[in-house]
Amino acid sequence: MKVPGIEAIFTYKDVDQNMKRFTCAGQTYPEPSPYDRLILDKHVRFIGDPVAIVAGADERCVDKAMKLIKTEYEVLEPLLDFTKAKDNEILVHPEDNWEALCPVGADNKRNLCAHDESGDGDIDKVLDECDIVIDRTYHTKACQQSMMETFRTFCTIDTYGRLHVVSSTQIVFHCRRIISHALGISPSKIRVTKPRIGGGFGAKQTSVSEIYPAFVTWKTKKP
C-alpha cells in the first residue's frame, strides 16, 4: 500500500471461495433468488464485476490507488446471447457451492436461475382451431427507480463488538440476514439501522451498498 491514506486492499484471495454463497435480493427466507454471489469472486463474469475493494481515508487517495492496481485476466469464451444460454456448454455459474433454496426451476448447470411452464386446457388444440395465430417476442427497455436519495451506507463496530450498519434501505432484517451470509457470521453480531430515507420505490429492497462497507469494517474494525 504505497499510497498514503490507504487502509486496506482486498481481493478474491481474502474471501473463501468455497464458503456458502448469498443473494442480494431482499426476499423472505428462503429466497427464490439463487445463492450465486461471493463478496469477491475469482470468476468474474462481466465488465464491472468487482475484482478488488480499496478502503482509504478519503476519496482522493482511493482514486489514486485504484489507478495503480493492475489486474490479469484469463479470458474465457463468452456467452453473449441469452436466447442461447439454456443448456449451453458455457456455464455462467459452474461452481459447486451455487445453491437454490426454493423450487423455482433453477439449475446452474443449465444456466437457469428460474424456469416455469404452465397452461390451462389443451393449448395446442385451441391454437390449431384458430384462424390466425400471432407469435411474437417482445422486449421491454431497462428501467430504474429515480429516488431523490441515492444508495448510502456506513458501518462501525459498536460497544458490544457488533457490526453496526447504518443504511438507506427498505429491508432492515433481510439486510442483516444477507450480510450474515456474505460474511459468514451470526446475525446476532450484526445490527442494521435504517434512518428516514429519501425514497426507494423498491430499488432499496436489495442489498446494493451494504455488503462492501460491512466487509471492510468487519475485517479492519474501522468505520
Describe the role of every protein-language-model region:
Residues 18-23, 88-91, 143-148, 199-204:
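Short, solvent-exposed polar/charged micro-motifs at secondary-structure junctions
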Residues 2, 10, 15-28, 55, ...:
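Cofactor-centric catalytic regions
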Residues 1-16, 52-73, 153-195, 200-220:
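Alpha-helical support elements that line or immediately flank enzyme active sites
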Residues 1-105, 136, 219:
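Flexible, low-hydrophobicity surface segments
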Residues 92-183:
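Helix-loop-helix junctions that connect adjacent transmembrane helices in secondary transporters/permeases
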Residues 38, 147-151, 210:
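Residues that act as N-cap/strand-start positions at coil-to-secondary-structure junctions
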Residues 33-34, 39, 86, 129, ...:
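Residue-level signal for pocket-adjacent positions within structured domains
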